[in-house]
Amino acid sequence: MKTTTEMQLVPITKLVPYVNNARTHSPEQINKLRSSLREFGFINPVIIDRDYGVIAGHGRILAAKEEGITKVPCVFADHLTEAQKKAYIIADNRMAMDAGWDEELLRVEIESLQAVDFDPLLTGFDENELSKLFDDGIDAQEDDFDVDAELQKPTFTKSGDIWILGRHRLICGDSTKEETFTALMDGRKANLVITDPPYNVNYEGSAGKIKNDNMASEKFFDFLFDAFSNMEKVMADDASIYVFHADTEGLNFRKAFDAAGFYLSGCCIWKKQSLVLGRSPYQWQHEPCLYGWKKKGKHQWYTGRKESTIWEFDKPKKNGDHPTMKPIPLLAYPIQNSSMANSVVLDPFGGSGSTLIACEQTDRICYTIELDEKFCDVIVKRYIEQVGSNEKVSVLRDGKVLPFTEVANTAPEV
């Protein structure tokens, strides 16, 4: 069998593209090739004849020129006749089109790349293709968990506990403290942040006040800035962030968001099916949600280009002790838009655990923080009810791993 035997670095200026090359190269493809060259280097050599006529590699040459590369590796194909050269130029492009993909293995490989913070777009697949690949057709459902009833039960979580809930992790701690995130993340990076911080409205239900919900404006900014800064440090460079908030504190949220290193792409609106009665002359029927990503990074998008900033989802049945509780389908919507299956989704204000349940239903992994021991209990019990078992539930406490049954049985009576 005849084969090539010599490779040289050849100045691009000496190469002669084939004038009748029928293969076209779109600007999008050239951009992908340029990204590939920057990441991997020029690995796949150009095939040429002894007159420096290009047989294969026209697209790579165009990308190299735009990258300012002056010499490229070339392999000489001495054994081809003129007719064989013409045929190979066509065959090299056409036969590649006959190859297919084992989509299950492809998903596994791309998920493993994202797990180590590697940009999946560098594989050559664009965002729409990745969206189709990971579209599992899952429709998240409301679980109707009774938060109010659970809050009345004895508390078994202690501050500092790290709960292992299947693949998910929950720490009972302070989101303004960097060490809380260090313990929670255990070396991993978040592929997405979606969170619902306190709104600073001084709400009080039958279970008591929501923590960190009544501060002076300056202190509330500092609170948000510290929390946002900690989030930014543990996010992958291509991770997006969604922050639900109250318009009455919109200025503090936006200032802290920007100061912590996030680019604000826009503000989405959750439109509820009915208004919420309050003291304002205009009754609120919506909640805003900041959307952005790290200023020093970029973002991933795994759906189409027809998604609106208006999100219409019914609010859940009343849970009086967590008035801003989000419906599961609402949270699943941005989760599926901005992450792939098996991605790590961070929620530093876990609340009643809606983000964790949305992650469980959409095959994501939730890492979450909650300051209030009572609401940590809610998250644990809500997860158990969702999966129907406490078999894979344990807590890391004082250096020991304890099963759920042992911890729950030691809760004091009220």
Each predicted region: which residue ranges?
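Polar low-complexity intrinsically disordered regions
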Residues: 1, 106, 410-414
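S-adenosyl-L-methionine
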Residues: 159-182, 380-414
